[in-house]
Design a protein with these regions (language model features):
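Acidic active-site catalytic centers that drive phospho-/nucleotidyl reactions
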Residues: 25, 111, 241
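Bacterial N-terminal signal peptides
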Residues: 1-2
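Extracellular glycoside hydrolase catalytic/binding regions
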Residues: 15-16, 40, 45, 107, ...
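A short alpha-helix capping/helix-coil boundary motif
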Residues: 32-33, 67-70, 74-77, 89, ...
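N-terminal carbohydrate-binding accessory modules
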Residues: 6-64, 308-312
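Aromatic-lined substrate-binding rim segments of carbohydrate-active enzymes
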Residues: 49-128, 163, 168-178, 254-269
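Acidic/histidine-rich helix-loop elements
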Residues: 27-53, 69-88, 247-250, 294-297
Protein backbone atom coordinates (compact mmCIF):
# COMPACT_ATOMS: atom_id res chain seq x y z
CA UNK A 1 0.00 0.00 0.00
CA UNK A 2 1.30 3.47 -0.90
CA UNK A 3 1.09 6.27 1.63
CA UNK A 4 1.59 9.93 0.69
CA UNK A 5 2.96 12.30 3.30
CA UNK A 6 1.20 15.65 3.54
CA UNK A 7 3.99 17.22 5.58
CA UNK A 8 5.46 20.25 3.83
CA UNK A 9 9.23 20.26 3.85
CA UNK A 10 11.05 23.54 4.36
CA UNK A 11 12.96 24.81 1.31
CA UNK A 12 16.61 23.87 1.51
CA UNK A 13 19.57 26.24 1.29
CA UNK A 14 23.11 25.36 0.35
CA UNK A 15 25.83 25.31 2.96
CA UNK A 16 28.07 28.36 2.75
CA UNK A 17 31.82 28.69 3.10
CA UNK A 18 34.45 31.38 2.69
CA UNK A 19 37.02 31.34 -0.11
CA UNK A 20 39.44 34.22 -0.05
CA UNK A 21 37.38 37.37 0.41
CA UNK A 22 34.03 36.00 -0.77
CA UNK A 23 31.17 33.85 0.45
CA UNK A 24 30.42 30.79 -1.69
CA UNK A 25 27.89 27.96 -1.79
CA UNK A 26 28.38 24.23 -2.31
CA UNK A 27 27.85 24.61 -6.06
CA UNK A 28 30.89 26.87 -6.25
CA UNK A 29 28.93 30.06 -6.89
CA UNK A 30 29.82 33.36 -5.26
CA UNK A 31 27.03 34.38 -2.88
CA UNK A 32 25.99 37.94 -2.03
CA UNK A 33 23.09 37.91 0.43
CA UNK A 34 20.79 40.91 0.86
CA UNK A 35 18.25 41.27 3.62
CA UNK A 36 16.92 42.91 6.73
CA UNK A 37 17.83 43.02 10.38
CA UNK A 38 15.19 42.91 13.06
CA UNK A 39 15.65 45.57 15.73
CA UNK A 40 16.71 44.80 19.30
CA UNK A 41 14.58 41.90 20.53
CA UNK A 42 14.26 43.57 23.94
CA UNK A 43 12.85 46.78 22.48
CA UNK A 44 10.65 45.41 19.69
CA UNK A 45 9.71 41.86 20.70
CA UNK A 46 6.38 42.19 18.90
CA UNK A 47 8.10 41.75 15.54
CA UNK A 48 9.90 38.57 16.64
CA UNK A 49 7.42 36.12 15.16
CA UNK A 50 7.30 33.66 12.28
CA UNK A 51 4.74 35.60 10.25
CA UNK A 52 6.93 38.73 10.20
CA UNK A 53 9.84 36.66 8.91
CA UNK A 54 7.66 35.11 6.21
CA UNK A 55 6.49 38.58 5.17
CA UNK A 56 9.98 40.09 4.77
CA UNK A 57 11.08 37.02 2.83
CA UNK A 58 8.09 36.56 0.55
CA UNK A 59 6.91 40.16 0.12
CA UNK A 60 10.13 42.16 0.53
CA UNK A 61 12.52 39.65 -1.04
CA UNK A 62 14.89 39.29 1.91
CA UNK A 63 17.41 36.49 1.33
CA UNK A 64 18.69 36.65 4.90
CA UNK A 65 17.31 37.91 8.21
CA UNK A 66 19.08 38.88 11.41
CA UNK A 67 18.02 38.25 14.99
CA UNK A 68 19.50 41.06 17.13
CA UNK A 69 19.67 39.59 20.64
CA UNK A 70 20.12 42.57 22.96
CA UNK A 71 22.72 41.77 25.59
CA UNK A 72 23.27 44.67 27.96
CA UNK A 73 20.78 47.37 27.02
CA UNK A 74 19.44 49.12 30.13
CA UNK A 75 16.45 51.03 28.76
CA UNK A 76 13.96 51.69 31.56
CA UNK A 77 11.26 49.83 29.66
CA UNK A 78 13.22 46.61 29.17
CA UNK A 79 15.95 46.46 31.81
CA UNK A 80 14.69 43.07 33.04
CA UNK A 81 14.62 41.69 29.51
CA UNK A 82 18.21 42.02 28.31
CA UNK A 83 20.20 38.84 27.83
CA UNK A 84 22.27 39.25 30.97
CA UNK A 85 19.15 39.41 33.15
CA UNK A 86 16.88 37.07 31.17
CA UNK A 87 18.89 34.74 28.91
CA UNK A 88 15.90 32.50 28.24
CA UNK A 89 14.09 35.39 26.58
CA UNK A 90 17.11 36.06 24.37
CA UNK A 91 17.36 32.42 23.33
CA UNK A 92 13.63 32.25 22.64
CA UNK A 93 13.81 35.37 20.46
CA UNK A 94 16.75 34.04 18.47
CA UNK A 95 15.20 30.62 17.95
CA UNK A 96 11.90 32.11 16.78
CA UNK A 97 13.70 33.95 13.99
CA UNK A 98 16.00 31.02 13.16
CA UNK A 99 13.14 28.52 12.96
CA UNK A 100 11.14 30.85 10.73
CA UNK A 101 14.14 31.46 8.47
CA UNK A 102 14.61 27.71 8.07
CA UNK A 103 10.91 27.28 7.32
CA UNK A 104 11.10 29.97 4.63
CA UNK A 105 14.33 28.75 3.07
CA UNK A 106 16.60 31.71 3.81
CA UNK A 107 19.77 32.32 5.79
CA UNK A 108 19.81 33.83 9.27
CA UNK A 109 22.38 35.74 11.27
CA UNK A 110 22.29 35.06 15.00
CA UNK A 111 23.60 38.36 16.32
CA UNK A 112 25.09 38.84 19.80
CA UNK A 113 23.92 42.45 19.85
CA UNK A 114 26.35 43.84 22.40
CA UNK A 115 28.64 46.82 22.74
CA UNK A 116 30.47 45.55 25.82
CA UNK A 117 32.58 42.47 26.51
CA UNK A 118 30.66 39.50 27.98
CA UNK A 119 32.73 36.44 27.17
CA UNK A 120 31.18 33.90 29.55
CA UNK A 121 27.61 34.79 28.59
CA UNK A 122 28.47 34.74 24.87
CA UNK A 123 30.06 31.29 25.12
CA UNK A 124 26.97 29.97 26.91
CA UNK A 125 24.62 31.50 24.34
CA UNK A 126 26.46 30.31 21.24
CA UNK A 127 27.02 26.86 22.73
CA UNK A 128 23.24 26.61 23.09
CA UNK A 129 22.54 27.88 19.57
CA UNK A 130 25.23 25.72 17.93
CA UNK A 131 23.99 22.62 19.77
CA UNK A 132 20.38 23.26 18.81
CA UNK A 133 21.14 23.95 15.14
CA UNK A 134 24.14 21.72 14.57
CA UNK A 135 24.43 20.91 10.88
CA UNK A 136 21.73 23.38 9.81
CA UNK A 137 23.14 25.28 6.80
CA UNK A 138 20.91 28.36 7.25
CA UNK A 139 22.65 29.60 10.40
CA UNK A 140 25.48 32.15 10.45
CA UNK A 141 27.01 33.22 13.77
CA UNK A 142 27.69 36.91 14.46
CA UNK A 143 29.61 36.87 17.71
CA UNK A 144 29.89 40.57 18.63
CA UNK A 145 27.77 43.20 16.94
CA UNK A 146 29.63 46.45 17.64
CA UNK A 147 32.54 46.57 20.07
CA UNK A 148 32.57 50.16 21.28
CA UNK A 149 33.59 52.04 24.43
CA UNK A 150 34.84 49.97 27.35
CA UNK A 151 35.11 53.30 29.18
CA UNK A 152 32.32 55.64 28.09
CA UNK A 153 33.44 58.48 30.36
CA UNK A 154 36.92 58.64 28.87
CA UNK A 155 35.84 57.34 25.44
CA UNK A 156 38.33 54.47 25.42
CA UNK A 157 37.53 51.80 22.81
CA UNK A 158 38.10 48.10 23.04
CA UNK A 159 41.32 47.32 21.19
CA UNK A 160 41.55 44.75 18.44
CA UNK A 161 43.75 42.65 20.74
CA UNK A 162 40.90 42.48 23.29
CA UNK A 163 38.29 41.77 20.62
CA UNK A 164 40.51 39.11 19.06
CA UNK A 165 41.03 37.32 22.38
CA UNK A 166 37.28 37.31 23.04
CA UNK A 167 36.54 36.15 19.50
CA UNK A 168 39.00 33.27 19.65
CA UNK A 169 37.31 32.03 22.82
CA UNK A 170 33.80 32.20 21.35
CA UNK A 171 34.90 30.72 18.01
CA UNK A 172 36.47 27.77 19.83
CA UNK A 173 33.19 27.14 21.67
CA UNK A 174 31.21 27.14 18.42
CA UNK A 175 33.77 25.03 16.56
CA UNK A 176 33.65 22.40 19.29
CA UNK A 177 30.10 21.72 18.06
CA UNK A 178 29.71 23.19 14.58
CA UNK A 179 32.88 22.58 12.57
CA UNK A 180 32.19 24.47 9.37
CA UNK A 181 29.55 27.17 9.88
CA UNK A 182 30.38 30.72 8.86
CA UNK A 183 31.29 32.95 11.83
CA UNK A 184 31.34 36.76 11.60
CA UNK A 185 33.76 38.61 13.88
CA UNK A 186 33.17 42.14 15.17
CA UNK A 187 35.82 44.82 14.70
CA UNK A 188 36.87 47.90 16.70
CA UNK A 189 34.93 51.14 16.99
CA UNK A 190 31.39 49.96 16.25
CA UNK A 191 32.71 47.49 13.66
CA UNK A 192 34.37 50.11 11.49
CA UNK A 193 38.10 49.50 11.93
CA UNK A 194 38.42 46.41 9.78
CA UNK A 195 41.93 47.56 8.95
CA UNK A 196 43.00 46.76 12.52
CA UNK A 197 41.78 43.19 12.09
CA UNK A 198 43.44 42.95 8.68
CA UNK A 199 46.82 43.71 10.24
CA UNK A 200 46.47 40.88 12.77
CA UNK A 201 43.79 38.42 11.63
CA UNK A 202 42.57 35.40 13.55
CA UNK A 203 44.36 32.29 12.33
CA UNK A 204 43.71 28.58 12.66
CA UNK A 205 40.06 28.63 11.58
CA UNK A 206 38.30 28.50 8.22
CA UNK A 207 35.06 30.26 7.26
CA UNK A 208 35.62 33.46 9.21
CA UNK A 209 34.35 36.84 8.08
CA UNK A 210 34.70 40.29 9.62
CA UNK A 211 32.02 42.87 10.33
CA UNK A 212 31.86 46.27 8.66
CA UNK A 213 29.00 48.63 9.59
CA UNK A 214 28.16 51.91 7.92
CA UNK A 215 25.56 54.64 8.14
CA UNK A 216 25.71 56.49 4.86
CA UNK A 217 24.96 59.95 6.20
CA UNK A 218 28.10 59.79 8.36
CA UNK A 219 30.38 57.24 6.73
CA UNK A 220 31.76 58.01 3.31
CA UNK A 221 34.65 57.01 1.06
CA UNK A 222 37.15 56.94 3.94
CA UNK A 223 35.38 53.94 5.47
CA UNK A 224 35.16 52.13 2.16
CA UNK A 225 38.92 52.64 1.90
CA UNK A 226 39.30 50.74 5.18
CA UNK A 227 37.24 47.97 3.63
CA UNK A 228 39.35 47.97 0.48
CA UNK A 229 42.50 47.69 2.57
CA UNK A 230 41.08 44.80 4.61
CA UNK A 231 40.13 42.90 1.47
CA UNK A 232 43.55 43.55 -0.05
CA UNK A 233 44.99 41.78 3.00
CA UNK A 234 42.67 38.81 2.45
CA UNK A 235 39.80 39.52 4.85
CA UNK A 236 36.26 38.53 3.90
CA UNK A 237 33.80 41.26 4.93
CA UNK A 238 30.12 41.07 5.87
CA UNK A 239 28.01 44.21 6.33
CA UNK A 240 25.69 42.76 8.96
CA UNK A 241 24.06 46.14 9.60
CA UNK A 242 23.80 49.38 7.66
CA UNK A 243 21.63 52.43 7.20
CA UNK A 244 21.22 55.38 4.89
CA UNK A 245 21.06 58.03 7.60
CA UNK A 246 23.46 59.38 10.22
CA UNK A 247 25.24 57.04 12.61
CA UNK A 248 22.84 57.98 15.43
CA UNK A 249 19.93 56.63 13.39
CA UNK A 250 18.54 60.09 12.73
CA UNK A 251 18.74 62.67 9.98
CA UNK A 252 17.53 62.37 6.39
CA UNK A 253 18.23 59.34 4.22
CA UNK A 254 21.29 60.19 2.12
CA UNK A 255 20.28 58.27 -0.99
CA UNK A 256 23.34 59.29 -3.02
CA UNK A 257 25.76 58.06 -0.36
CA UNK A 258 23.70 54.91 0.22
CA UNK A 259 23.79 54.08 -3.48
CA UNK A 260 27.56 54.55 -3.50
CA UNK A 261 27.79 52.02 -0.67
CA UNK A 262 25.47 49.57 -2.42
CA UNK A 263 27.51 49.77 -5.62
CA UNK A 264 30.72 49.18 -3.64
CA UNK A 265 29.25 46.16 -1.85
CA UNK A 266 27.92 44.65 -5.06
CA UNK A 267 31.20 45.28 -6.89
CA UNK A 268 32.97 43.34 -4.13
CA UNK A 269 30.33 40.61 -3.58
CA UNK A 270 29.75 41.73 0.00
CA UNK A 271 26.54 40.59 1.71
CA UNK A 272 24.56 43.22 3.59
CA UNK A 273 21.53 43.73 5.83
CA UNK A 274 19.56 46.93 6.37
CA UNK A 275 18.74 48.18 9.90
CA UNK A 276 15.96 47.76 11.13
CA UNK A 277 12.52 46.21 11.51
CA UNK A 278 11.26 48.42 14.32
CA UNK A 279 8.77 51.23 14.90
CA UNK A 280 10.72 53.79 16.93
CA UNK A 281 10.40 57.48 16.12
CA UNK A 282 13.70 57.62 14.24
CA UNK A 283 14.88 57.54 10.65
CA UNK A 284 16.44 54.06 10.80
CA UNK A 285 13.21 52.37 11.93
CA UNK A 286 11.46 51.09 8.83
CA UNK A 287 7.96 50.90 10.27
CA UNK A 288 5.36 53.16 11.83
CA UNK A 289 3.50 52.16 15.02
CA UNK A 290 0.49 51.34 12.81
CA UNK A 291 2.34 48.35 11.35
CA UNK A 292 0.93 44.99 12.42
CA UNK A 293 3.32 42.84 14.44
CA UNK A 294 2.95 39.92 12.03
CA UNK A 295 2.65 41.86 8.77
CA UNK A 296 1.70 42.37 6.04
CA UNK A 297 2.74 46.01 6.02
CA UNK A 298 1.03 48.42 3.66
CA UNK A 299 2.80 51.41 2.14
CA UNK A 300 1.16 53.67 4.71
CA UNK A 301 2.83 51.61 7.49
CA UNK A 302 6.33 52.35 6.17
CA UNK A 303 8.66 55.19 7.01
CA UNK A 304 10.71 56.63 4.11
CA UNK A 305 13.64 54.34 5.00
CA UNK A 306 11.35 51.30 4.89
CA UNK A 307 10.10 52.29 1.44
CA UNK A 308 13.68 52.77 0.23
CA UNK A 309 14.78 49.37 1.56
CA UNK A 310 11.78 47.54 0.13
CA UNK A 311 12.53 49.02 -3.29
CA UNK A 312 16.19 47.98 -3.02
CA UNK A 313 15.34 44.40 -2.11
Amino acid sequence: MFFMSCTRQAPQVERLHVEGTVLMNESGDTVELKGMSFGWNVLWPRFYNADAVAHVVNDWGSEIVRAAVGVEIDDDECVVKNYLTDPDFGKQSACTIVDAAIENGVYVLVDWHAHGLHTEAAVEFFTYIASRYKGVPNVIYEIWNEPSYKDHVNQIDYTWAEIKEYSETVIAAIRAIEKDAVIVVGTPRWSQNVDDAANDPIIGYDNLMYTLHFYAGTHKEWLREKGDYAMSKGLALFVTECGGMNADGQGPVDEESTQAWIEWMEDNDISYLFWSISDKEETCSMLLPSARSEGPWAEEDLRPWGKFVKEQL
